[in-house]
């Protein structure tokens, strides 16, 4: 059964002071779905999020929350449906973690902000869910960035929203806290069926955590679809105008620009034995060639990105004589051979012959292991 739609935009244009920056934005968010905005710095991701969160006025078009026009929702009514965590840091003085989390109950408390037993139970439940209960008596300002971000997530959950909007929630976090935070977010969307709309700079994480990706650049949405649809055919390189390297769609990581020129080193690799060496050679400014690899080999994406020349066979095909002759010709023009492989089988037997050919020719050979 298809999940209920929580939010959608219709012909939305956003900007500042009446000037349109991004036009005709059409996106939707369903229960239990994570939708992520990506794009270059200054593309307008935060502007879109702030407009959807009613912090900026729409220039044209509309935002609908469960088919109710955003303009018709009162502040407290919206706060019961939508919570936000933006990049601007809050600096509450002399407030404990529990105090900050409890601020999320403001849509439900009176003017004095007095918590009822139910409110206190929700605060405790949210701290437990985000695993910050042991910190509840700590001063918020004494926490690490990762801990603060978890507290702000718990505060947002205290509103008991259906929609959660996050602007670059992992920007200040190290890799451990990034993974922990996004894992919590993913678990929360599954269990509570909350819809999450956020922006991320980390493309590898966006690819892994998102159900849909919205690509923001220029005056329009450049692309909108599943990660499998967006992270394909070199689109990310085009979106970010990458020239000093390339985004590897299969791995979700980036490789720096290859060293040009005539290959000085020939690398015999495969089965993941060569990728670290390829990067080491690139760092040292040494142009190199690689062979023979299958195009399905784990080393192939890095080789294709960093090597001047790659002699490769089609995926799942045996290496043939033509591959051997092409590799031999390139290898013999190099000053050195580096062999990363220690095990040779039936498929890569021609790589063993290449190594033997290098020995017979008296070439300098280095056996390399990570």
Question: What does each model-found stretch correspond to?
Answer:
Residues 38-40:
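The feature captures the beta-strand-to-loop junction immediately N-terminal to the Walker
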Residues 53:
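Helix-to-loop junction immediately C-terminal to a conserved catalytic motif
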Residues 61-69, 78:
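Conserved ABC transporter NBD signature motif
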Residues 102, 117-135:
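Conserved ABC ATPase "signature" region
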Residues 160:
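Conserved catalytic motifs of ABC-family nucleotide-binding domains
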Residues 164-168:
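Catalytic Walker B motif of ABC-type/P-loop ATPase nucleotide-binding domains
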Residues 241-322, 339-352, 364-370:
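ABC ATPase nucleotide-binding domains
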